[in-house]
Amino acid sequence: MEMDLNNRLTEDETLEQAYDIFLELAADNLDPADIILFNLQFEERGGAELFDPSEDWQEHVDFDLNPDFFAEVVIGLADSEDGEINDIFARVLLCREKDHKLCHILWRE
C-alpha cells in the first residue's frame, strides 16, 4: 500500500471526517441512553481530539500504523468546556491518505 505524504487530509479534515462517520454510525452502535446523553451534553462538554494511533490498535488491525498516515480521533465528553475528554463514546482510527479510505471504530461498551 503506497501512500503519498502530499496527499493527506489535514488535521481539521481528519477530525471532521471522523466526527461525520461517528454521527452516521452512532445509532447502530451505542445505547439509546448514551446517544441522548451525548446529544444533550455535546454543545457544552463534547469534543473530538486527534492523536497518533495508540498501541492497543495493534490488537484490532494487522497493518503498520505509521502516524504520518494514520490518526486516532477520540470522541466524547469532558468534565468541563476546556477539559480533557474522559467520557469516551468512540475511538476512530482513520487513514489520512486521501486515496486509501480506511476507518475502524471502537465503540463505548
Swiss-Prot record:
What this chain does, per the record?
May act as a double-stranded DNA (dsDNA) mimic. Probably regulates the activity of a dsDNA-binding protein.
One Pfam family from the record: DUF440
The uppermost taxa in this organism's lineage are: Bacteria, Pseudomonadati, Pseudomonadota, Gammaproteobacteria, Enterobacterales
Q: Which organism is it from?
A: Citrobacter koseri (strain ATCC BAA-895 / CDC 4225-83 / SGSC4696)
Give the record's family classification. Belongs to the putative dsDNA mimic protein family.
Query: Which protein are we looking at?
Result: Putative double-stranded DNA mimic protein CKO_01325
Q: Which InterPro entries match?
A: dsDNA_mimic_put, Put_dsDNA_mimic_sf
